[in-house]
């Protein structure tokens, strides 16, 4: 998987940062797909500056209904339809997301020529497609807001083909059954258990993408042990009280959570427009003083998971 940041500014766009949108490229060998997390104003234009086709977009997750995370959605939905894309799309978001989308389309005389499903969520598991699952956690923000934990299921270990050949198992369809952990019977009556010829399963990757939030009870469970944690760092340490009063977090709080949760990497985003490039580096230094494995997301930055 890889993350592509399409927008990294808090509240309003700046000359160098658009408002929030994060693309997740699943990079699965047999199931291509793109997921979008939040869709601030101008997201579809940001997408044009990448190599990714909106037709590959099959899921959109909205954290909350503040405009800097939402106002790009109607335009993206309509442009996707006008481009002749017919692949289905599912939107997940808090209560009110259905009314917002349906009202925007109705009042503007717009529609989609592809199947569009809108799922209003609460806290808990959203879905499990057999390859990965997504769970929503409640954030601390003035509006109903969620963070998302994306977990790949463990992958089966490699099949020991040499040992199977030595045991007299012919290569072919039987290998596929054994790789699935099944038990087969050979012509000579012997039973071969696939589990005996599989290496240790390969652990799946885990990712936490926080919505806007101040410190909250669910944060640790959402982030615990993930490979990558994406978290806002709207303001610096000196402005922590102001950040919290508005349902946001400081650099110190994001980094301290990453350390406590034992994450592999912290990526900070949702930077206040008060910070220029020099100020953003100040935010990064504050985080790294607490959690060294921190990166600052800029628009169009790409991170592997």
Curated annotation (Swiss-Prot):
Q: Which residues bind Zn(2+) 1?
A: 64, 66, 141, 212
Keyword line? Endonuclease, Exonuclease, Hydrolase, Metal-binding, Nuclease, tRNA processing, Zinc
Q: How is the cofactor bound?
A: Binds 2 Zn(2+) ions.
Q: Where does Zn(2+) 2 bind?
A: 68-69, 212, 270
Record InterPro entries? Metallo-B-lactamas, RibonucZ/Hydroxyglut_hydro, Rnase_BN, RNase_Z/BN
Enzyme Commission number(s) of this protein: 3.1.-.-
One term of GO molecular function? zinc ion binding
- Chain segments annotated as transmembrane: none
Cofactor(s) of this protein: Zn(2+)
Active-site residues are 68
Q: What does this protein do?
A: Zinc phosphodiesterase, which has both exoribonuclease and endoribonuclease activities.
The family database entries (PANTHER family) matched by this protein are listed as: ZINC PHOSPHODIESTERASE ELAC PROTEIN 1 (PTHR46018:SF2)
* Xref: HAMAP family: RNase_Z_BN
Homology family: Belongs to the RNase Z family. RNase BN subfamily.
Please give the subunit comment from the record.
Homodimer.
Q: What protein name applies here?
A: Ribonuclease BN
Q: In the UniProt record, what gene is named as encoding this protein?
A: rbn
């Amino acid at each position: 998987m890889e993350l592509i940041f399409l927008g990294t500014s808090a509240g309003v766009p700046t000359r160098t940062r658009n408002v929030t949108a994060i693309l997740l490229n699943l990079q699965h060998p047999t199931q291509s797909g793109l997921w979008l997390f939040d869709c601030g104003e101008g997201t579809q234009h940001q997408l044009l500056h990448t190599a990714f086709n909106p037709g590959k977009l099959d899921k959109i997750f909205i954290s909350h209904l503040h405009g800097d995370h939402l106002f790009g959605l109607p335009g993206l939905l309509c442009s996707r339809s006008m481009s002749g894309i017919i692949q289905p799309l599912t939107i997940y978001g808090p209560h009110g997301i259905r009314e917002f989308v349906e009202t925007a389309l109705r009042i503007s005389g717009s529609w989609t020529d592809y199947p569009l499903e809108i799922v209003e969520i609460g806290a808990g598991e959203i879905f499990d497609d057999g390859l990965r699952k997504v769970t929503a956690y409640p954030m601390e923000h003035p509006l109903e807001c969620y963070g998302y934990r994306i977990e790949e299921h463990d992958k089966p270990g490699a099949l020991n083909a040499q040992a199977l050949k030595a045991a007299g198992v012919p290569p072919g369809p039987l290998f596929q059954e054994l790789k699935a952990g099944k038990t087969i019977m050979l012509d000579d009556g012997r039973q071969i258990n696939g589990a005996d010829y599989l290496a240790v399963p390969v652990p799946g990757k885990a990712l936490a993408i926080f919505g806007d939030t101040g410190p909250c009870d669910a944060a640790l469970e959402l982030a615990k042990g993930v490979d990558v944690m994406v978290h806002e760092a709207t303001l610096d340490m000196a402005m922590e009280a102001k950040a919290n009063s508005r349902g946001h977090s400081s650099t110190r709080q994001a980094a301290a959570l990453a350390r406590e949760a034992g994450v592999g990497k912290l990526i900070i985003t949702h930077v206040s427009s008060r910070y220029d490039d020099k100020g953003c580096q100040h935010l990064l230094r504050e985080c790294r003083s607490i959690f060294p494995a921190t990166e600052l997301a800029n628009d169009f930055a790409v991170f592997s998971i």
